[in-house]
Amino acid sequence: LALCGGEMRVYPAKTVILCCGGAGNVYAATSNTRDVTGDGYAMAARCGLPLRGMEFVQFYPYRIYSPKRADIFPDLFDHGAVLRNEKGERFMDCAKYPMKELENRDVVARAEFAEKEVRLDLSGCDKAYLERECPNIARMARDNPDKPLLIRPVAHFFMGGVPLRTDCSTDVAGLYACGEVTGGLHGAN
């Protein structure tokens, strides 16, 4: 598929490797670039291949979406940042989540989905660390003192896809696959 013009072009080949991203853009909120739209899955399906495990999608829980978009890195929580719900409560508490905000991504994402609103609280962060290691987030907080930094999970990685053999071949002769377009390699998470 030609990106300019959108017409289909045929290039005969003895071997083809599907190596493309997942389909993050089927979700309104994703960490994927705009071109990750499931094209590899569609090509595989057009060749008659089954897709498996497509219901398993990993969500990245650390995305600021308002007042601007930005990813935060988990080590920020080692330096005093916490997640709070719309009532101001820290919902990733020790009783239920021993590792708090540093639980596995799927655990944090599910906890966030259960809340009405999730806010990033930076009040406990060392300011020098924040300015040095996360200058864009520090600037966002400084430039918007009356607006909370709102967090939500975003679609990140499809665990399912094209079934493979150990040599990356598929059930279609000459068609191989690797990368996120493949399925059954990563389990449900």
Please provide the spans of the model-predicted regions:
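Alpha-helix capping and helix-loop boundary segments enriched in small/acidic/polar residues
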Residues: 4, 8, 27-35, 71-74, ...
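Glycine-rich phosphate/pyrophosphate-binding beta-alpha loops
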Residues: 22, 29, 59-62, 159-161, ...
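Conserved beta-strand-loop-beta-strand element in the redox core of flavoprotein oxidoreductases
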Residues: 1-10, 16
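An anion/pyrophosphate-binding glycine-rich loop and adjacent beta-alpha core
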Residues: 43, 49-148, 152
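A conserved FAD-binding loop/helix module that cradles the flavin
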Residues: 26-43, 47, 172, 184-189
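Short hydrophobic core segments
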Residues: 11-21, 44, 176
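A glycine-rich dinucleotide-binding beta-alpha-beta segment and adjacent secondary-structure elements
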Residues: 3, 135-182
